[in-house]
Amino acid sequence: MTLRTLFLSATFSLLSASVALSASVSVFKDAGCGCCGGWISHMRENGFAVSATNVAPEIMDVVKAKAGITADTASCHTALVGGYVVEGHVPASDVQRLMDERPDAIGLSAPGMPVGSPGMEGAGAEPYDVLLIHRDGRTEVFASH
């Protein structure tokens, strides 16, 4: 590895880290949900500044509807970051990729509560997809885990 390549790699790594560090995440969640705290910790461990607001279940329904989250894309918590919606247990690496690529979309969702996703760690992790939610409501696989 040349010195120039090493320098460019280090610069890119620092730049990527600074993007995550500057991204502020606002989470709306039910006060009784323990897995949401696990996801919040995961995001913080990956350099995101996170604030959380506990809301009543009926308010969560309103938050999700206003954010463009449907029953097919819903999970337990809804977050706003960088002008996007992040629904559920989406890994920080996918959120960072969303911030880097900036697609014309509503945001990302890990529908349901997939075992093995951030905040849902446990035995028997299951494969799951993170969906990109387009503005017209269509979804496509953004990442598979």
Summary of predicted features, one role per range:
Residues 28-31, 53-55, 89, 111-113:
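Active-site-proximal beta-strand/loop segments in catalytic clefts of secreted hydrolases
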Residues 32, 39, 56-59, 91-95:
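Stable alpha-helical elements in mature extracytoplasmic
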Residues 22-46:
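Local sequence-structure signature of Cys/Sec-based thiol-disulfide redox active-site neighborhoods
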Residues 2-18:
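Bacterial N-terminal signal peptides
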Residues 59-65:
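Structural motif
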Residues 28-30, 49, 81-86:
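Second-shell loop/turn segments in exported
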Residues 65-145:
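Thiol/selenol-based redox catalytic cores and closely related redox-interacting motifs
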Residues 40-58:
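Conserved helix-turn-beta segment immediately C-terminal to the redox Cys motif
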